[in-house]
Amino acid sequence: MTTDRRLEILRAIVDEYVETQEPVGSKAIADKRALGISPATIRNEMAVLEEEGLITQPHTSAGRIPTDRGYRLFVDKLSTVKPLSAAERRAIETFLEGAHDLDDVVKRSAKLLADITKQVAVVKYPKIGDSQGREMMAISGTANLARSGEDLGNTLSPILEALEEQVVLLRLLSDAHPTVHVTIGSEQPDSNLQSTSLVTVGYGSDASLGILGPTRMDYAGSMAAVSAVARYVSRFITEGGK
């Protein structure tokens, strides 16, 4: 069973890897984290984390990177949703206050989420009244995937195809929870998206929004941004844009 100390080491590996994109070694953790233990002890604990399938060693490196299971444990047990700064909250409010109708607010929300998280943002339109029309969504930030080419490798093309078709994303967004939900890597039901993570939340009548990006993402920041934008969009709909 993973101890509190190992969880702290896992947190350090995730944080460092997300920030640097480089596999993480025991010395880097000892130098940057006040854990009060030696690099040798950290190496021993990392060996256990590797046995538990939470981290893995790339072929060309002495360091370790998180696995999908490691990210899942990080999100479930370690990651606290960090609040947005006052400046970020004001930026969201100001940007969305300029919207003059539902279509505008949905498109603005997608662009805003993509800009904040540097990932692909998807926003599903809410149902209006008894409308039985086809489901619609707005997508922004597709170019951000190209900047993640090293993370996504040869899976980039299938991901772009899935985004273009939209059917897969609409199905995933239809399963969105009223609270922020994270689907990581191999948990994705569509095999074309299993090098990505999806952070989603519902915000209105059969409506949802979220971001899609490589599994090496800032989960805490992405969860905070998705939650905050959903609150503002929900308020816009409830108050009729006032």
Predicted regions: what they are:
Residues I9, T67, I211:
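Conserved RecA-like P-loop NTPase ATPase core
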Residues M1-R11:
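Short alpha-helical segments that sit at the start of domains
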Residues L10-D15, S197-T200:
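Contiguous, well-ordered alpha-helical segments that form the cores/surfaces of helical PPI scaffolds
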Residues R72, S79-K242:
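Intrinsically disordered, acidic Ser/Thr/Pro-rich low-complexity regulatory segments
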Residues M1-T2, I37, P66, L84:
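Alpha-helical hairpin
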Residues D15-E19, P23-K77:
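N-terminal helix-turn-helix
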